[in-house]
Swiss-Prot record:
The PRC barrel domain binds ribosomal protein uS19. One of its GO terms (biological process) is rRNA processing. This is Ribosome maturation factor RimM. InterPro entries: PRC_barrel-like_sf, PRC_RimM, RimM, RimM_N, RimM_N_sf, Transl_B-barrel_sf. Binds ribosomal protein uS19. PANTHER family: RIBOSOME MATURATION FACTOR RIMM (PTHR33692:SF1). The gene is rimM. Pfam families: PRC_RimM, RimM. The keyword Nucleotide-binding does not apply. Belongs to the RimM family. Its main location: cytoplasm. Residues 101-178 form the PRC barrel domain.
Length: 178
């Protein structure tokens, strides 16, 4: 492992180390990719936590009940592996596959202003949640918002009418009273 960081703006968080596994330095990882095993397609990761940055290489990985179990190059001790708990797993944005014109990565949606069919500004997308049925956007108020309410909006075709990344706006079909 070395400590040469990528440019922070070029990195995308794709997972998180949450625990250790066994005594040989393996770590348990929660993957934000879909399917979760896609995280194993990236052989080099940048790890970040509380201002610390580390570059690591993936040796192997496999699925487990609560995510993935991963072996990193040069990490052979349980105590050393425990120190990585809480680290975000990042990859360069340039490694993400291209999407169709009407598809978006979550990171592209975060920060968009959310405006409904009545031109009411609800706020900005703060983050998204995976619920099983459909993804849910957490919209928090911002300057100029209709009110101070946090809203949970489904990320579905019925709700999301249009997305304009350049303008930083998402148009939705959603009543202000919901």
């Amino acid at each position: 492992m070395n400590a040469t960081p990528e440019k922070a703006d070029d990195l995308i968080v794709v997972g998180k180390i949450f625990s250790v596994h066994g005594v040989r330095g393996e770590v348990k990882v929660y993957s934000f990719t879909d399917p979760i095993e896609n995280l194993l397609d990236y052989p080099r990761w940048t790890l970040r936590h509380e201002g610390k940055v580390k570059q690591v290489e993936l040796v192997s990985g496999r699925g487990s009940q609560k995510g993935l179990v991963v072996k990193l190059k040069g990490l052979d001790d349980r105590d050393e592996a425990r120190l990585l708990s809480g680290y975000e797993i990042c990859i360069p944005r340039s490694l993400l596959p291209n999407l169709a014109a009407d598809e978006y990565y979550w990171y592209q949606l975060v920060g968009l202003k959310v405006i409904n069919q009545d031109e009411q500004l609800f706020g900005k997308v703060d983050h998204l949640l995976e619920t099983g049925a459909n993804d849910v956007m957490v919209v928090k108020p911002c300057a100029g918002s209709l009110d101070d309410r946090e809203r949970l909006l489904p990320y579905t075709e019925q709700c999301v009418l249009a997305i304009d990344l350049e303008a930083g706006v998402m148009r939705v079909e959603w009543d202000a009273d919901f």
